[in-house]
UniProtKB/Swiss-Prot annotation:
Active site residues according to the UniProt entry: 12, 131
Pfam families in UniProt: His_biosynth
Subunit details: Heterodimer of HisH and HisF.
Name of the protein described by the UniProt record: Imidazole glycerol phosphate synthase subunit HisF
Compartment(s) where it occurs, according to its Swiss-Prot or TrEMBL record: Cytoplasm
Role summary: IGPS catalyzes the conversion of PRFAR and glutamine to IGP, AICAR and glutamate. The HisF subunit catalyzes the cyclization activity that produces IGP and AICAR from PRFAR using the ammonia provided by the HisH subunit.
Native source organism of the sequence: Herminiimonas arsenicoxydans
Reactions performed catalytically: 5-[(5-phospho-1-deoxy-D-ribulos-1-ylimino)methylamino]-1-(5-phospho-beta-D-ribosyl)imidazole-4-carboxamide + L-glutamine = D-erythro-1-(imidazol-4-yl)glycerol 3-phosphate + 5-amino-1-(5-phospho-beta-D-ribosyl)imidazole-4-carboxamide + L-glutamate + H(+)
Top EC class of this enzyme: lyase
Length: 254
């Protein structure tokens, strides 16, 4: 049986509001996180990803109250990331109602965190987020702190290392494509998908429904994440699922 591919709307949150930017900058308000999460649940989203995009760079605490409010209204799997620095942060997020926890900047400063968290809570709830940008030498470099800090790490090698330490999924964002609506970086997505055996969630650049199809068929992603096309009413999740299903992709249709 073919495993169904997933559509995951992404809620980037700062100061308690959902926002959307271009290339990780120029943030525009998109609404209240609880309202938006409820709408996507009603539309049949497979999961939601909730990223506190300024938590790490600002050093702010986890926004547990918002997560508790969202989790009380939403009954699909919820991945939450942003500001996760210790195994205890993972515990607090899971207790607040998250099903999975995203680790990004802290995975680089402390890779042991990925191992320890996956050992304690299981790989299935540890998602490592990789924000990658094409470098001058043709490889993809990993960035942290909301895309502000270069690491010198190769994205493909880093994904392999994270898998070996116990990550259950990779959330792979092309910073070059973020918010541009020109489609995923399919070379990046396919290169990482081919290099590891855990699921890859493609992120960054969706402008239309065909981009979602391409992420799966060409990029070989297991799930596709999008924000702009859903937040501003361009498409519903149901439309996206139907379109992907019509293109021969196994989807959970509601």
């Amino acid at each position: 049986m073919t495993l169904a591919k997933r559509i995951i709307p992404c809620l980037d949150v700062t100061a308690g509001r959902v926002v959307k930017g271009v290339n990780f900058l120029e943030l525009r308000d998109a609404g209240d996180p609880v309202e938006i999460a409820r709408r996507y649940d009603d539309q049949g989203a497979d999961e939601l990803t909730f990223l506190d995009i300024t938590a790490t760079s600002d050093g702010r605490d986890l926004i547990l109250d918002i997560i508790e409010a969202v989790a009380s209204q939403v009954f699909i799997p919820l991945t939450v990331g942003g500001g996760v620095r210790a195994v205890d942060d993972v515990r607090r997020l899971l207790n607040a109602g998250a099903d999975k926890v995203g680790i990004n900047s802290s995975a680089i400063s402390n890779p042991q965190l990925v191992f320890d968290a996956s050992q304690k809570y299981g790989s299935q709830c540890i998602v490592v987020a990789i924000d990658a940008k094409k470098a001058a030498d043709g490889r993809w470099e990993v960035f942290t702190h909301g895309g502000r800090k270069a690491t010198g790490l190769d994205a493909i090698e880093w994904a392999k290392k994270m898998e070996s330490l116990g990550a259950g999924e990779i959330l792979l964002t092309s910073m070059d494509r973020d918010g541009t609506k020109v489609g995923f970086d399919l070379d990046l997505t396919r290169s990482v998908s081919d290099a590891i055996s855990i699921p890859v969630i493609a992120s960054g650049g969706v402008g239309g429904l065909q981009d979602l199809v391409d992420g799966v068929k060409i990029g070989r992603a297991d799930a596709v994440l999008a924000a702009s096309i859903f937040h501003y009413g361009q498409h519903t999740v149901q439309e996206a699922k139907r379109f992907m299903s019509e293109q021969g992709i196994a989807m959970r249709l509601t």
